[in-house]
Amino acid sequence: MTGKALLKPHWLRVKAPQQQRIGEVAELLKGLNLKTVCQEASCPNIGECFAGGTATFLIMGPGCTRACPYCDIDFDKSPRSLDPTEPERLSEAVAQMNLRHVVITSVNRDDLSDGGASQFVACIEAIRQRSPLTTIELLIPDFNGNWDALAKVMGAAPEVLNHNIETVPRLYKRARPQADYMRSLELLYQVRQGWPKVYSKSGLMVGLGETDAEVIEVLEDLRRHRVDIVTIGQYLSPSPKHLPVDRFVTPEQFEYFRSMGETELGFLQVVSTPLTRSSYHAGEVQRLMAAHPR
């Protein structure tokens, strides 16, 4: 990871966060011993999301069995056993925060036979029991292509299923050496084929070395695999030890990706801005579901 770092452009500046609300949410999460991807992955939107009383919960962590060189979550080849109290603690946080829409994601757990699918199910069931009106979005790993594990998760009936494609296929060996582009596409297709009422979602980063043409090709692939919602955001390197930023994509180009995806390719929604992350403003999906009921 060498080379001079690019200077961050002005459009990547974020508003000063509301420290009081951030502190309140952080204290709640600490008290319940819960992690968020907002904190663990150094998300630039943490101030806005915490100030709005929302968070994307990270389960089965903190260590991840994969070591993707763009990601700020710690690698752990032998992570701790799953915590059976985690689902109940998560449901308590959702209830206390009075969330209308909750996003749950996880680290990769390749050490588990089902990749952690059972823990996702337990979390959904706990939330349904305590907060039955809250809609649930899952951001899942690829389960190493274990479609039985996927079926287990989908059987718990989340409203939205997200699996991020992350980058263009040419960069997989460099950025996602333990993942497979076609496997991720197949997972997304399986979701729409087997559970057509569920809204499928995926996301990718730009600035890792891809071209604009390659981004469009990924969008075309995602649409062919019947994905409904796509997020596109700027990659920001967490540290000098991680993959460097290759380019900063302009807001105008992000708008082009959005327009192409929605008007030409027919996605229900493309959220494409420099600061977009896969669960940024995820609560807006409720309006999308109301406009396109299934």
Curated annotation (Swiss-Prot):
InterPro entries: Aldolase_TIM, Elp3/MiaA/NifB-like_rSAM, Lipoyl_synth, rSAM. SMART domains: Elp3. Pathway: Protein modification; protein lipoylation via endogenous pathway; protein N(6)-(lipoyl)lysine from octanoyl-[acyl-carrier-protein]: step 2/2. Residues 50-268 form the Radical SAM core domain. [4Fe-4S] cluster 2 binds at C64, C68, C71. Keywords: 4Fe-4S, Cytoplasm, Iron, Iron-sulfur, Metal-binding, S-adenosyl-L-methionine, Transferase. One of its GO terms (cellular component) is cytoplasm. Its cofactor is [4Fe-4S] cluster. Coiled coil: none annotated. It is found in: Cytoplasm. Gene3D superfamilies: Aldolase class I. [4Fe-4S] cluster 1 binds at C38, C43, C49, S279. Its EC number is 2.8.1.8. The keyword Thylakoid does not apply. GO terms for molecular function: 4 iron, 4 sulfur cluster binding; lipoate synthase activity; metal ion binding. It catalyses: [[Fe-S] cluster scaffold protein carrying a second [4Fe-4S](2+) cluster] + N(6)-octanoyl-L-lysyl-[protein] + 2 oxidized [2Fe-2S]-[ferredoxin] + 2 S-adenosyl-L-methionine + 4 H(+) = [[Fe-S] cluster scaffold protein] + N(6)-[(R)-dihydrolipoyl]-L-lysyl-[protein] + 4 Fe(3+) + 2 hydrogen sulfide + 2 5'-deoxyadenosine + 2 L-methionine + 2 reduced [2Fe-2S]-[ferredoxin]. Its main location: cytoplasm. Binds 2 [4Fe-4S] clusters per subunit. One cluster is coordinated with 3 cysteines and an exchangeable S-adenosyl-L-methionine. It is an enzyme of class 2 (transferase). Belongs to the radical SAM superfamily. Lipoyl synthase family. This is Lipoyl synthase 1. The gene is lipA1.
